[in-house]
A protein has these predicted regions:
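Transmembrane alpha-helices
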Residues: 13, 18-25, 151, 157-164, ...
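Membrane-interfacial helix termini and adjacent extracytoplasmic/periplasmic loops
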Residues: 38-40, 47, 112-150, 184, ...
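Non-cytoplasmic
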Residues: 26-37, 157, 198-232
């Protein structure tokens, strides 16, 4: 009897937890289709708020900036993070532990501290460049935004790719060298195919975090406006149903990216399990 009550309490807790997490999002999605501007009573279904987004030049401009920054920073961060992971994997155990702990600091560091510290660095550069003729007078704007996004994305790539490298059988790489491959060929034919799911998953994570970031972007964007900053500016005046529609689209896009990333990781896990059991892996 006690076990039955305990299970009921556990289920009730899980249900309450998910309601607490997702009811506000569900409420927002429902009222993004509301006919009226009010958010207390649903008066009818409409798509006009989604249509009006397509004619909002400020939102479209901010969306373009966010996508450009997310794609460019995700690609660069993925390349740098993968290269760093290869270097970390080749270190001794003690050195690898030290570098891993150092890399972990930006992940646990509050975003506001990261944003302000990067801003101070860019301001210091700007003051230094005033006395150097061949340096740009200012880089605040798209350059600083890209650097900031790359900086906070690289650790996530390292933590995603390094575990996969640890699982890699180094004998496969050595066998490729023995069979006549040079180090570059062995990397592209043996190592890269094995870690490519982790690399792609890391890229999707970087893309998600970059699109979603507000705090670090806010301090380092200059006059450039990303989508989260544009939404923040809109909410300071009034909460329009357009914001509900825009937030719903962002939620669906980010959720899709996360689901794709999780599906890839799950597929890779089952593939590894089949390989361990000696089954045919396709």
């Amino acid at each position: 009897m006690k076990t039955k009550h305990l299970r009921l309490m556990q289920r009730a807790y899980v249900i309450l937890f998910f309601c607490f997490m997702y009811l506000p999002i569900a409420y927002m999605i429902v009222f993004s289709f509301n006919q009226s501007k009010g958010y207390a009573l649903f008066t009818g279904f409409t798509l006009k708020w989604y249509t009006s987004l397509l004619h909002n030049s400020a939102i479209l401009s901010a969306l373009r900036v966010s996508l450009e920054v997310a794609l460019i920073s995700a690609v660069i961060a993925t390349v740098l993070g993968t290269a760093a992971s290869l270097g970390i994997a080749s270190m001794s155990r003690k050195s690898r532990l030290v570098i891993t702990n150092i890399t972990y600091i930006p992940v646990v560091n509050p975003e506001i501290i990261t944003g302000i510290s990067l801003m101070l660095l860019f301001v210091a550069y700007q003051r230094f460049s005033e006395g150097v003729s061949w340096l740009p007078d200012t880089i605040m704007g798209m350059p600083t935004l890209l650097i900031a996004h790359i900086a906070f994305n690289v650790p996530y790539v390292i933590f995603n790719v390094t575990p996969k490298l640890k699982q890699l059988d180094i004998k496969l790489y050595e066998a490729a060298l023995d069979l006549g491959c040079d180090p570059r060929q062995a990397f592209f034919k043996v190592i890269l195919p094995e870690i490519s799911p982790a690399i792609l998953s890391a890229f999707l994570i970087c893309l998600t975090y970059s699109i979603d970031d507000f705090m670090i972007s806010y301090f380092n964007c200059g006059t450039v406006e990303t989508l989260p900053i544009a939404i923040y500016s809109m909410t300071r005046k009034k909460v329009s149903p357009e914001i509900y529609a825009l937030s719903t689209i962002m939620f669906v896009v980010i959720l899709t990216i996360i689901l794709i990333s999780n599906a890839m990781e799950s597929r890779e896990y089952h593939r590894d399990q089949k390989a361990l059991r000696g089954e045919d892996v396709k």
